[in-house]
Curated annotation (Swiss-Prot):
Stored PANTHER family: 30S RIBOSOMAL PROTEIN S18 (PTHR13479), SMALL RIBOSOMAL SUBUNIT PROTEIN BS18M (PTHR13479:SF40)
Subcellular location(s) per record: Plastid, Chloroplast
Record PROSITE patterns: RIBOSOMAL_S18
Designated name of the protein: Small ribosomal subunit protein bS18c
Subunit structure, interactors included: Part of the 30S ribosomal subunit.
GO molecular function (one): small ribosomal subunit rRNA binding
Keyword field: Chloroplast, Plastid, Ribonucleoprotein, Ribosomal protein, RNA-binding, rRNA-binding
Transmembrane stretches, start-end: none
Source organism: Cyanidium caldarium
Native organism taxonomy: Eukaryota, Rhodophyta, Bangiophyceae, Cyanidiales, Cyanidiaceae
Gene3D superfamilies: Ribosomal protein S18
InterPro entries reported in the protein's UniProt record: Ribosomal_bS18 (IPR001648), Ribosomal_bS18_CS (IPR018275), Ribosomal_bS18_sf (IPR036870)
Any one biological process term the GO annotation gives: translation
GO cellular component entries: chloroplast; ribonucleoprotein complex; ribosome
Length: 68
């Protein structure tokens, strides 16, 4: 699971509406990929986590994957 994910430099690009971007930070089982694997900074990873959680609550993204 050593895939390099391109993280945008603009922090405004990371929000709950950009589901195609934040889906890359979710594993096959539906869990958020840790910071040490994605090689993102602490600040960016917190923004990503917040965006994923907001998208899940609104209903844009599932909490669990269907095949798991």
């Amino acid at each position: 699971m050593n895939k390099k994910i391109k993280i945008p430099k603009d922090s405004k690009a990371i929000n709950y509406k950009t589901t195609d971007l934040i889906r890359e930070f979710i594993s096959d089982r539906g869990k958020i990929i840790p910071q040490r694997i994605t090689k993102s900074t602490r600040k960016k990873h917190k923004l990503i986590e917040k965006a994923i959680k907001q998208a899940r609550l609104i209903g844009l993204m599932p909490f669990k994957q269907k095949n798991w």
